[in-house]
Regions:
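Short, intrinsically disordered, charge-biased short linear motifs at domain edges
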Residues: 21-28, 39-46
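Short Cys/His-rich "knuckle" micro-motifs
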Residues: 46-50, 63-69
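Conserved catalytic cores of soluble enzyme domains
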Residues: 169-288
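Extended interfacial segments that mediate partner engagement and assembly in macromolecular machines
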Residues: 71-125, 131-136
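N-terminal alpha-helical interaction blocks
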Residues: 1-25
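Cleft-lining beta-strand/loop regions that shape enzyme active-site pockets
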Residues: 115-194, 201
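Short cysteine-rich clusters marking metal-coordination/redox-active sites
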Residues: 37-40, 55-58
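Residues immediately within or flanking Cys/His clusters that coordinate Zn2+
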Residues: 34, 52
């Protein structure tokens, strides 16, 4: 009888959950919030890297832009940029080269792969150059060569020391032989500066390779390097296939080069400004 029928134990609901509940968005973590350290492979909260961009676990130094390095190195509000507005003539009419340059300029805020000018470091005036690997891997083309050459010529005329932070993937292939001639062009300007008994300090950063290594990067009176910076001419695989030997794991690292006499000292990023200031003072730095 219906009067005494047993009630269901459960309440029946619509099995289609979307009909009564709106789907919740999946939580997302912004890409720029964390980074994986190439050295220790740990995932690091960006804020833990600090302004110096150094891994708190293993001390690996992340690559930084020219403007970031400028802020870490020079006295506040002392930098005056020079030699801007120089543009390549695109000698090979390389496909899409000018479009690529325009895009990279917009992305980096730089006109080329090297930032040049004068600045004070610990109160001492220097001619300063900082290469930026974010700009087509800081490859050396005609404009990079011209800016660095003019920097040395200016420093020679004004009797200033030169401090140059190097970083490069080598010569800029889009400019062919014109890029290669920059090696000799800059080296000649370095030689004139040296003949005037003026101080030239290079700071090798990751990566410094190719024609930059084969010329002005290794011509400094003192050659500094950041720890674990990759410094070399040809690539590791190219060398191994040529000599048919397995190279050491630390081959082309700054520490390996120091052991073999190619680098004078290795300095942690946090100590570079102080160390550069000391070296300038020892070599008769001019206070402004």
């Amino acid at each position: 009888m219906a009067l005494f029928s047993k009630k269901d134990k459960y309440i029946r609901i619509n099995p289609n959950r979307s009909a009564w509940k709106e789907p919740q968005p999946k939580p997302e973590v912004p890409d720029e919030l964390f980074s994986q350290c190439p050295g220790c492979k740990h995932t690091i909260y960006q804020k833990d890297l600090g302004s110096e961009r150094v891994c708190p676990n293993c001390g690996y130094t992340f690559r930084i832009s020219a403007k970031e390095r400028l802020a870490l190195t020079v006295d506040p509000a002392s930098f005056e940029e020079m030699f801007t507005g120089i543009e390549t003539t695109d000698p090979l009419n390389f496909p899409n080269y000018k479009k690529k340059l325009a895009a990279v300029r917009e992305m980096t805020g730089l006109d080329e792969a090297v930032l040049t000018g004068t600045a004070l470091i610990k109160g001492q005036k220097v001619a300063l150059g900082i290469m930026d690997s974010n700009f087509i891997m800081a490859s050396m083309g005609s404009v990079v060569g011209e800016k660095i050459t003019r920097l040395f010529e200016f420093a020679t005329k004004e009797k200033l020391p030169v401090v140059l932070f190097t970083a490069s993937g080598g010569a800029r292939m889009q400019e062919g032989i014109v890029s290669l001639m920059q090696m000799a062009k800059i080296s000649a300007a370095v030689q004139h500066h040296s003949k005037e008994k003026l101080f030239y300090l290079t700071v090798l950063t990751d990566p410094t390779t190719g024609g930059v290594t084969a010329s002005f990067a290794m011509e400094g009176d003192i050659i500094m390097a950041e720890s674990q910076a990759l410094v070399g001419f040809a690539g590791r695989r190219v060398i191994e296939s040529t000599v048919r030997e397995k190279l050491p794991d630390d081959f082309q690292k700054a520490e390996f080069l120091q052991e073999h006499g190619f680098v004078d000292l290795i300095v942690e990023r946090s100590q570079i400004r102080a160390t550069v200031g000391q070296l300038l003072a020892l070599h008769g730095g001019k206070h402004d």
